Amino acid sequence: MRSTPLLLLSCLMLPLGQRSSDDPLQHLPSNIEVLTHFGERADISPDNQRVAFMAKSFGDAMVIDLKSRVIQCLTCNVPAAVFLRVMHLGTGDYILIGPDHFENTHTSRTRDNELWYLSKERGSKPIKLGQKMSEGAAISKKSLKIAFSQTAAQAPDLAPEASRLIVADLDLSGTPHLINKKTVYESKDRSCTLEAQDFYDDDRKMTFTCYEPEGRSSVMGIDLQTGEVTNFSKAPGTYNEVEGIFPDGLYTAVEADRQCEQLGGQRGSGNIDIWKLRLDGTGKDFTRLTHFNDYEGGKSSNPVISTDGRFMAFQSARTTDAAGVGYGILLYWFNR
């Protein structure tokens, strides 16, 4: 999820009757349960047995076993760890995202953001992949394929307002490193700032977000074989950030502000909840999944879907915080 200035996250509420003053965690439906009481940016293991997450922004990566509910710290052997994301590879190993050290929030999230490899073997330490990148990454569940975006902050060869999507393979035959890097799409200006999200259709296609001016965004997809790009959300003037994809590749989870049509409030990445979008290119099949934004200051974000489609992990968040900040991981059961 992209980091967005707090100005765009502020909530301009309509009269208080529009949103409840209660705590959304006290009104969870029967298919949602609290998994942890801290943490953010969850990622489900390929075998659906564990959920990795960040303890906090610029902090340690953790993993929780879904049966025992035992939490293990993955990076506590790294002094002053300042990672921002943890994601599973298909091998069960991990990709970490974040800076080498903390300078300040802006510089460390942008210029210094890079990819790391972490073995699943206990006691392993992160290994730099030598790749600066922007925001999050797409990680294949079926291969060692990775995709990420870059802006001029990480790639000085880009024009100041340009961004690009790069697909690469992770080579684990020796010291982990990226090979076969290929730019698959480029935006020339701020009308669309890119962020990779998920592979689907046997890694032949990929979803990504197009961040637009004035705090808006669109759900996009690219056919990696033909280069054809599709706007799946087709809702100009609104916020639609693509998140975890469903295993059938027909639907994706989306952070969206569509509920503001009924609830009021400033549109953008502050007033969001989780929606389900059919990737048929019409932008019409949107279903709301969570209702945290029905409550003053509440939102839910950063959803990921299990590979069997049975559940979703996401986080409880606050409208006034920066994007990605969370206060605990929850599970949403589609089918127990």
Language-model features: locations:
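Sec-dependent signal peptide recognition
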Residues: 2-8
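Sequence signature of WD/YWTD-type beta-propeller architectures
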Residues: 19-336
